[in-house]
């Protein structure tokens, strides 16, 4: 009986370790494809494969979100201010806000969202969405970018998206480094400290 218990416990432990290893390996291999091109708040093209040789902090949002999205953006503003004081923001790291609702979040809407947080339109924080002319293909691109980082979302039909609650730190080649919680759980000091260690 004791032998069976030991074997069962060992198998359960192996299963847990295998599961943890799977998720660690999956995250380590996560990367936004370089071929993805989206539209900025200025109606310019942003291609992930272009020479953006900076770390990137990425959040996925929709501007009609009533709580967690604007809370995250506000906390990222506080983080931006910390990074600006040390001369890191813009020089070594770029912020990206990607809309998961490009039908409503036009470039103009994204610019208004940016302005509502007092964010400078200087290219150091880029707001990405789809283009009206290619909205269907851009929807797929946004989904591909999100899925590459295991960020999931769905519109249940009422315009209020159900979505994952993580932001993502990427390296200069858009490869996953670490994820951080969104909303009230986003700790700007913790993220600041982690980013500083990467530089």
Label each PLM-derived region with a short phrase:
Residues 49-70, 76, 95-96:
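Short active-site neighborhood of thiol/selenol oxidoreductases, capturing the structured segment around
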């Amino acid at each position: 009986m004791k032998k069976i218990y030991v074997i069962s416990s060992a198998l359960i432990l192996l299963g847990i370790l295998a599961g943890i290893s799977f998720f660690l390996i999956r995250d380590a291999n996560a990367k936004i494809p370089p071929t993805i091109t989206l539209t900025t708040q200025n109606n310019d093209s942003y291609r992930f494969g272009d020479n953006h040789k900076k770390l990137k902090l990425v959040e996925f949002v929709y501007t009609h979100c009533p709580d967690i999205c604007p809370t995250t953006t506000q906390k990222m503003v506080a983080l931006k201010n910390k990074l600006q004081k040390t001369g890191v923001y813009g020089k070594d790291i770029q912020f990206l806000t990607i809309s998961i609702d490009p039908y409503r979040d036009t470039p103009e809407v994204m610019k208004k969202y940016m302005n509502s947080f007092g964010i400078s339109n200087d290219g150091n924080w880029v707001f990405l969405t789809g283009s009206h002319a290619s909205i269907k293909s851009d929807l797929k691109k946004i989904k591909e970018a999100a899925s590459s980082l295991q960020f999931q979302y769905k519109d249940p039909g009422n315009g209020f998206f159900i979505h994952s609650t993580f932001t993502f730190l990427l390296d200069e080649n858009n490869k996953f480094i670490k994820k951080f919680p969104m909303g009230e759980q986003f700790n700007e000091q913790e993220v600041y400290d982690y980013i500083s260690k990467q530089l």
